Amino acid sequence: MKINVFETKEELYRAVADFYIKAINEKPNMTLGLATGTTPIPLYQNLIKAYQDKLVSFKDITTFNLDEYIGLPKTHKESYFSFMRNQLFNHVDINLDNTHIPSGVLEPSEAIKEFQTALDAHQIDIQLLGLGSNGHIGFNEPGTSFESTTHKTQLALSTIQDNSRMFDSIDEVPTESITMGIKDIMRASKIVMIATGAQKADAVYKMIQGPVDESLPASILQKHDDVVIFLDKDAASLLK
């Protein structure tokens, strides 16, 4: 693991954006694994600005998103389909036919099969991850098998509580999702993890310095050959 710690979130997100701009310019047709939630938004904002400044192009990029809520139509403002269009895709030159997000409205078994088939046909060059306060990656909650592929998952209460800030009330937060599995995530050539804030410090510590155990899904990253972690000082505060 290569661990980068920054004084401020602004410095962190500039560094992550520079990392992606360099990587995309070196391989313009790469396949990116993307994440949702509040963590990647500043990265996407920096990448949009870089595109507007003609520093990077996404026209030959293929993307796979980690997950989608079950039961939310694409048109729902909090679906990850809508999120990706609003936060990135609508603002850059990406071909939407080359973007892949699990379906939240198909029968879950069909959605899983459709997404896994597309995923298996590609090699993800860089997989972006955020970190749940309970150590989840994607929507792979504690206890998920390290051998898991794309699957339906029940969201942990802590995840529902964390995500409720995006909804009008906690009762509106979906309780199930389809997520890329941990085995799929680990198949990526490179993994980029972003974690900020003191509320993530315990999960960061366990991810990096704790035992590799399915009770802390992100701990599996210790077994990957090429992981780059971007932390602000608050998220890194428990590291020794």
Swiss-Prot record:
Keyword Iron-sulfur: no
Functional description taken from the UniProt entry: Catalyzes the reversible isomerization-deamination of glucosamine 6-phosphate (GlcN6P) to form fructose 6-phosphate (Fru6P) and ammonium ion.
GO terms classed as biological process: carbohydrate metabolic process; glucosamine catabolic process; N-acetylglucosamine catabolic process; N-acetylneuraminate catabolic process
Gene3D superfamilies referenced in this protein's UniProt entry, alphabetically: 3.40.50.1360
Gene Ontology CC annotations of this record: cytoplasm
Protein name according to UniProt: Glucosamine-6-phosphate deaminase
Entry EC no(s): 3.5.99.6
List of catalytic residues: 67 (proton acceptor), 134 (for ring-opening step), 136 (proton acceptor), 141 (for ring-opening step)
Lineage of producing organism: Bacteria, Bacillati, Mycoplasmatota, Mollicutes, Acholeplasmatales
HAMAP family: GlcN6P_deamin
GO molecular function: glucosamine-6-phosphate deaminase activity; identical protein binding
Keywords: Carbohydrate metabolism, Hydrolase
Domain of life: Bacteria
Originating gene: nagB
Substrates-to-products reaction catalysed: alpha-D-glucosamine 6-phosphate + H2O = beta-D-fructose 6-phosphate + NH4(+)
Database matches in Pfam families: Glucosamine_iso (PF01182)
Pathway(s) annotated for this protein in UniProt: Amino-sugar metabolism; N-acetylneuraminate degradation; D-fructose 6-phosphate from N-acetylneuraminate: step 5/5
Family: Belongs to the glucosamine/galactosamine-6-phosphate isomerase family. NagB subfamily.
Top EC group: hydrolase
